[in-house]
Amino acid sequence: MNNSIVTYETFHGSAKKIAEVISDKLNCKCINIDTPFEAEDLKEINNIILVFNFRGPYTAQLTKLYLNRVKEQLKTKNVILVGEGLFSEKEFPVVAEEIYKNNPSKTFTKFFVNGQLRMDTLFPEERVLLKKFSELTGMEIKDMGELDLNKAEEIASEIENLIDTEEFKSIKDVETSENLEEKGTKWVCSICGYTHYGDNPPEKCPLCGVPKEQFKEQ
């Protein structure tokens, strides 16, 4: 599927391993984030798959800076984010808001590959964050052992099926903020910052999955 490209961060080697599994499955190019998109021909690319390791504030900030750098290239693409490790309560809103802000009319999908985690090495405040994360996502928080490349294979297959759907095949015009605002009341997810326009909030947030009660009218 050469209408996709996989890009990964270089701070953690596990992100590269996952990216290679996905690109092999999709038969598409795999580049690291130090390779500028400007050097790639993206005209025929519909789907950009981002692979990042999430272990702390540094990688969250790295992701945000990278997404801001490539925001023009993301505007007309479907974005798939594969996170290895765990998001913290502080990290996920940073990433989700950045993607949605720059990509409001295209599809955004997220997957997780459980990575290395040792519960007995965590600080108390980190345990609190993980508990909140577990409640929000339904992911069980436990010692994870080594990088789960079998899970990466499963996700690669899910992505392969996903990008073959009509929703991902169709290229829509990017809607401006003005056009979105004409659609009604502005609702903002209090957890991840996703913005929805309409008479009512969505039943659940398409980014972080929380119920509509978490949306605030603005």
Sequence positions of predicted segments:
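Short beta-strand/turn micro-motifs composed of small residues
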Residues: 7-8, 52, 83-85
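Short Cys/His-rich micro-motifs in 6-15 aa windows
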Residues: 208-218
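N-terminal beta1-alpha1 ligand-phosphate binding loop
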Residues: 2-25
